[in-house]
């Protein structure tokens, strides 16, 4: 035993080589959030996520998942086609034929029951007499046109049925008409969620953002004395809001502010910390948006760093790890590594795939800005490596960075360096500069002394 020696560096390095880096597919699978997102989404909202995954997962499994997802809806023709694909059959069971007939009959029934009130609500002379007072509106329609509560409720039932059939545009209109007249707060809240989903599924982003505000207001007022109900409903709203968040540019600022607000950041930290991925992606890509003021962006970045630091034990992925490496640990090598992994995760995420290039671009800017702040002389080759670029690409990148950010710096092409003309350093920067080289040695010495105090 006494003759044993620690393993050599060569042994350790050869051992590391036996565990090669994960492939992009392995990274994407490891950080796939679909199982966490599904419980907070309506089944119709889950469908586009499954569609997106069909290019990444086993096609047969995706088809089966679609069937299980939609078999209880009234999208009878589509569900029947999925059944035929799963069972490799040209024929469908009688139950599908029967259900289709029932759905068509029900649609006809709802159309007849709601015909009078829908016609009235399309009559400009009638609509002109409606006011913000729902009770007065109902009284007017009842006295002047014979409208009943049952007719109003038929709009709700018809809208829900159209939604179940996949007729989202019709559903949105019917639920809107119901909401204008109904005084049933529970049904109005349900109709608002239904209209929100319908606007998402028809990609009507401006209308969807109007529903975000209505749902938010409903949560605050209807559930003001029900903290658990508020937590659950806020969690749903956060997840549903991901659709306009990354598909409608004007939504970005509104939803970033909403997610950072005390009630919603608390919801994220308590109930769904994986949403930090989307918040981090939004904040980092916000850097590229020309209208974004520096002070607002710095505030968002500061808030993001704080939350990522707090929640690191609860949730992390390459996107949040990138933030931690760069702004908490000041580890540029780790930040560059995590940026590479983050790119794989972003390209495999339904909500973030379109932001991938913008994220990588912004992240490289953040790495280079942070690196330049704490170094006086920068080796172009070294910085290029940290940005994941070759030397020529890195040189062009740095030239553009100096031009775009107007930093006081000059490039020494002969030496392959950038000379930063920093203003007098803050205490914060001086501490980083002085400790970055000594930190590792200090920690090792302290560790050795703790283990071997008498040596």
Swiss-Prot record:
Biological function: Component of the eukaryotic translation initiation factor 3 (eIF-3) complex, which is involved in protein synthesis of a specialized repertoire of mRNAs and, together with other initiation factors, stimulates binding of mRNA and methionyl-tRNAi to the 40S ribosome. The eIF-3 complex specifically targets and initiates translation of a subset of mRNAs involved in cell proliferation.
Quaternary organization: Component of the eukaryotic translation initiation factor 3 (eIF-3) complex.
Biological processes, Gene Ontology terms: formation of cytoplasmic translation initiation complex
Superkingdom, natural source: Eukaryota
Subcellular location: Cytoplasm
Record keywords, A-Z: Cytoplasm, Initiation factor, Protein biosynthesis
Domain named PCI: residues: 256-425
GO molecular function: translation initiation factor activity
HAMAP family per record: eIF3e
Name of the molecule in the record: Eukaryotic translation initiation factor 3 subunit E
């Amino acid at each position: 035993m006494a003759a044993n020696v620690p393993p050599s560096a060569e042994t350790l390095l050869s051992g590391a080589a036996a565990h090669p880096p994960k492939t992009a597919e392995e990274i994407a699978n490891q950080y796939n959030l679909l199982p966490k997102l599904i419980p907070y989404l309506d089944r119709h909202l889950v469908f586009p996520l499954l569609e997106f995954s069909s290019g990444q997962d086993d096609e047969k499994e995706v088809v089966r998942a679609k069937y299980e997802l939609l078999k209880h809806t009234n999208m009878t023709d589509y569900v029947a086609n999925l059944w035929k694909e799963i069972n490799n059959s040209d024929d469908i069971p009688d139950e599908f034929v029967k259900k289709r007939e029932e759905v068509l009959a029900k649609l006809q029934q709802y159309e007849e029951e709601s015909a009078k009130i829908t016609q009235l609500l399309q009559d400009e002379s009638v609509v002109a007499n409606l006011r913000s007072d729902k009770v007065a509106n109902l009284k007017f329609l009842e006295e002047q046109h014979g409208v009943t509560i049952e007719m109003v409720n038929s709009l709700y039932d018809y809208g829900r049925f159209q939604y179940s059939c996949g007729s989202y545009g019709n559903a949105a209109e019917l639920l809107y008409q119901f909401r204008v007249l109904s005084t049933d707060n529970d049904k109005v809240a349900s109709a608002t969620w239904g209209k929100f989903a319908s606007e998402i599924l028809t990609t009507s982003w401006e209308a969807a953002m109007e529903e975000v505000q209505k749902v938010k207001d409903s949560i605050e007022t209807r559930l003001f004395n029900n903290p658990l109900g508020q937590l659950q409903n806020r969690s749903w709203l956060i997840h549903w809001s991901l659709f306009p968040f990354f598909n409608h540019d004007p939504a970005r600022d509104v939803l970033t502010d909403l997610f950072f607000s005390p009630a919603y950041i608390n919801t994220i930290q308590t109930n769904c910390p994986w949403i930090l991925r989307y918040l981090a992606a939004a904040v980092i890509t916000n850097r590229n948006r020309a209208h974004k003021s520096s002070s607002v962006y710095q505030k968002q970045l500061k808030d993001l760093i704080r939350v990522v630091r707090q929640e690191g034990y609860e949730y992390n992925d390459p996107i949040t790890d990138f933030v931690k490496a760069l702004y908490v640990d000041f580890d540029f090598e780790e930040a560059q590594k995590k940026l590479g992994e983050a790119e794989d995760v972003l390209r495999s995420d339904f909500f973030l795939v379109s932001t991938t290039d913008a994220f990588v671009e912004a992240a490289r800017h953040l790495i280079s800005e942070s690196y330049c702040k704490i170094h006086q002389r920068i080796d172009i080759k070294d910085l290029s490596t940290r940005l994941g670029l070759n030397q020529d690409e890195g040189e062009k990148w740095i030239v553009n960075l100096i031009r775009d950010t107007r930093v006081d710096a000059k490039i020494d092409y002969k030496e392959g360096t950038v000379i930063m003309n920093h203003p007098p350093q803050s205490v914060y920067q001086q501490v980083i500069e002085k400790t970055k080289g000594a930190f590792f040695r200090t920690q090792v010495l302290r560790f050795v002394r703790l283990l071997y105090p008498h040596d």
